[in-house]
Regions:
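A short beta-strand-to-alpha-helix junction
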Residues: 76-82, 128-138
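Formylglycine-dependent
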Residues: 1-102, 110-124
């Protein structure tokens, strides 16, 4: 987890987006043991702590000096709004650091430049969202 590698907080997913939506595919294994061992973890909210938690989580490994909250899967439907969630979390983090008078570094990556992208209906088929559309031709 990023929070045991120098980050104070992390909110997001650890996989490329199509790995997150694979469990929704018709041919994805339905066996709960398979999903528990190989399925993607959800959207995670993690915080570094000073307390060493020796618990070994079957999905995350040794917890260590952090807290880990799985906020749920990154489904195709949630992908429509995940950038809103992560942007809100980033702004909240920055505001808290400013209010505390602490210097900070915020690494914020949205999902819109990645393959696969699922957007809300009102954002579909808008000019400029599809590569090549509105590009001058030679």
């Amino acid at each position: 987890m990023p929070t045991v590698h120098g980050f104070d907080e992390f909110f997001g997913n650890l996989y490329h987006l199509n790995a997150e939506e694979e469990p929704e595919n018709f041919n994805y294994p339905r066996d709960p043991a398979f999903r528990a061992k190989f399925g993607p973890r959800g959207v995670l909210r993690c915080k570094a702590t000073d307390v060493d938690d020796p618990t070994v989580d079957p999905r995350f490994g040794r917890v260590g000096k952090q807290t880990i909250e799985d906020t749920g899967p990154l489904t195709r439907k949630r992908m429509e709004t995940i950038d809103d969630e992560t942007s809100d979390a980033a702004v909240d983090y920055m505001r808290r650091q400013i209010a505390a008078g602490k210097p900070f570094f915020c690494w914020m990556n949205t999902t819109r430049m990645h393959f696969r992208t699922h957007v809300r209906p009102e954002h579909r088929d808008n000019p400029g969202l599809i590569a090549g559309r509105n590009m001058p031709t030679a």
